Amino acid sequence: MHDAPVGVRGSDYNSVFPSGQTTAATFDRALFYNRGFAMGSEAKGKGINVLLGPVAGPLGRMPEGGRNWEGFSPDPVLTGIGIAESSKGIQDAGVVACAKHFIGNEQGNLTQGFGIRGRSHVNQGL
């Protein structure tokens, strides 16, 4: 199991793939899939069974959060397409895709702890 927002981490000779945000800017379904397949293929070659990715959020609501580049877009349709095609590509390469960072991730602080405070009416709207 490896963290993988832009490819395999924690081993030698890894590729670094374009961020989710950069990939989403193309609006190209095939590119989402091919990026996922390439990430999955590299992971499989290194003996990795699960990639922690693709990244569904942050939604881009908090610019100072610093993790907006990991997700695809604040647009839910584009993010859904990105998650679906990327996950399919990763899994077609024989590796389990584990989507991560859902609601509230970008407004967290003290990220080594547990729990993110959010306003209930905001969370319900998301």
Which residues does each PLM region occupy?
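Glycoside hydrolase catalytic-domain context in secreted enzymes
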Residues: 1-126
